[in-house]
Amino acid sequence: MKIAAFDIGGTALKMGVMARDGRLLETARQSINDSDGDRILQAMLSWLAAHPSCEGIAISAPGYIDPHSGLITMGGAIRRFDNFAMKSWLETRTGLPVSVENDANCVLLAERWQGKAAEMANFLVLTIGTGIGGAIFCQHQLINGARFRAGEFGYMLTDRPGGRDPRRYSMNENCTLRVLRHRYAQHIGAPLDSVTGELIFDRYDAGDPVCQRLVAEFFNGLGHGLYNLVHIFDPQTIFIGGGVVERPGFLTLLRQHLAWFGIADYLDTVSHGNDAGLIGAVYHFNQLYRSPDDDRH
C-alpha cells in the first residue's frame, strides 16, 4: 500500500510517496509564500492527482490538532487552517482515508518508530523552525493534552516580561531562525530574504562579531527553555529537530553553548532530518487505520 504523505511548514510543503512501513519512495518540495493555505491545499490535490496509486493520505501540520477527527482548531502561521476540518475536507474530495497530526508530534513518532528513541519510555522533541514546536512522550505514551496543545514549548518565557505582551519574551520570539535572520538583516541593512540561517552560521564560524553575539543569544534562549524542560519532565533525551540541525557540527555547537546550564548530555538531534515529519505522519496513519490482524503497523 502506498501512502501520500505531506509535511506542511510555514514556508514549504514537503510531499512524498511512502510505503506503509515508512520507506520513502519519492519526495518533492514546494515553497509556500505567506503561509498560503489555499495554495497548500491545491498543491496537495495536484500531488495526489499525479500519484493515483496512493491509497491513503498522511499529513503532518502545524497547530492544535485533534489527531482522531483531524480538526485543526488553530493552524499556527497558516490562518486559513484555523477551525478547519482538514481530514473531512480531503476525504470528501479524494475518497481516500486521511490522517492529520501535529508536526512536532510527527517528528516524535518518527523517532520512536524508526530512530534513537525506539527503546525509550520518556523523551521530548523540540523543533526549531518558523516557530518553536515540541512533543512529549511520557511513560510510553504521546501526550496530546486536554485541548491538543501539549508540547507548545515555544510559549515558554526566556526572560522576565518587561512590557504588556509576554509573548515578546517567549522562545518563539527569541529562539527561532526567523528571529535570528530578522535581527541580522536589520543590523546589516539587508532584505530579510537575502539573509539565511546558513549565512549567519557561516559568518559565525568565520568569527563575525555580530553573528557571534546573535548566535550566542539564540543558544542562550534555547538553554533557558531546555533547562526548564529537563527539570519538569525528567526525560532520557531531548531530541532537537528542524533544518538547522542538519548543519555539520550543530550538535557539538549546541552542547558547547549549553554546557553552562548543565544539560548538554540530555541533548541529541533527530534521526531523520527533514524526512521526520513524513515518516511520523505515516506512523500516525498506520495507528489510525490499524486493522485487527495487522500488528506490523
UniProtKB/Swiss-Prot annotation:
Induction: Highly induced by cellobiose. To a lesser extent, is also induced by gentiobiose, cellobiitol, and methyl-beta-glucoside, but not by arbutin, salicin, esculin or phenyl-beta-glucoside. It catalyses: D-cellobiose + ATP = 6-phospho-beta-D-glucosyl-(1->4)-D-glucose + ADP + H(+). Its EC number is 2.7.1.85. GO terms for molecular function: ATP binding; beta-glucoside kinase activity. Catalyzes the ATP-dependent phosphorylation of a wide variety of beta-D-glucosides, to produce 6-phospho-beta-D-glucosides including cellobiose-6'-P, gentiobiose-6'-P, cellobiitol-6-P, salicin-6-P, and arbutin-6-P. Is not able to phosphorylate alpha-D-glucosides. May have a dual role of kinase and transcriptional regulator of the cellobiose-PTS operon. Homotetramer. This is Beta-glucoside kinase. It comes from Klebsiella pneumoniae.
